[in-house]
Amino acid sequence: MKIVVAGGGYAGLSCLMEIADRLPDAERVLVDPSRWHLRQTRLQEALRRSLDGLRTPFSELGDQYGFRHVRASPSLSRKALARASAAGRLAGEGIDEDFDALVVAVGLRPRPRPRQARWVGLADLKGTDGRRLVRRIIEEAGGPSDRVTIVGGGATGLQYLFELRDALRREGAKTRLALVDPGRRLLPGQPDEFHAYVAERMEQSGITYLGGYGLASAGDGELELKGRQGGVRRLRSAFSFSFTGMKGLSL
């Protein structure tokens, strides 16, 4: 039996490991255009160490868990998957693999960020040296009157917020920081005490917290925020990050 898994993120690798346990004799193939798996939940660590430390080559993982990696990015549209299913073969640029079962594990992508030059999103951080990014922020927005804004107060946004603050302070930057989040409180799935603790930490760290506001539009160095209860607020921001969650892949 031959099983092809498309997508080398956490879901795809978990699937391959589960298959290895349940069907150890099956031939297993991973299809992903990258050379390595990137631990996205720890991207904030790249602000203080090399991004290479968060990457594991698929070749090493394949040796460890018994699968073969094919670097390719075939179409996974509804029509392409229907053709592949009927033929029992996944074909496209860089790949031509028959299969008995095909698993598609590429369902989530970061929501797009505003296109202005001083905006960074999760997709950008996957290939960005964090320490160089800190130096860029200091060069372009390192003064006490400048502000760096994190839009999105989920787990990733919060981790990045505090890690970025520490990285800027280590370099002596006086840049102010702000967090913008549309929710009434942070991480609503957690107890109320968690929100209170994080809000207190932000206050102690001099971070401006704008809860109940979402991003309406982004201009040159200025954000237009829309409140949950109505009203519009404008915020000067010399550099901004977008951590507004993930969206599903349309098949």
Predicted regions: what is each one?
Residues 1-68, 158-190:
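Beta1-alpha1 glycine-rich phosphate/pyrophosphate-binding loop at the start
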Residues 3-6, 10, 14-18, 23-26, ...:
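Localized chelating/binding microdomains
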Residues 9, 154, 244-245:
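A short acidic Gly-Thr/Ser loop motif
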Residues 25, 69-71, 76, 169-251:
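A Rossmann-like FAD-binding core segment of flavoenzymes
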Residues 37-40, 111-114, 250:
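Short acidic/His/Gly/Ser-rich catalytic and metal-binding motifs that mark active-site loops
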Residues 51-56, 131, 192-199:
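Short, surface-exposed alpha-helical segments at coil->helix boundaries
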Residues 66-147, 230, 241-243:
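FAD-binding core/adjacent interface of flavoenzyme oxidoreductases
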Residues 133-177:
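Rossmann-like NAD(P)H-binding beta-loop-alpha module
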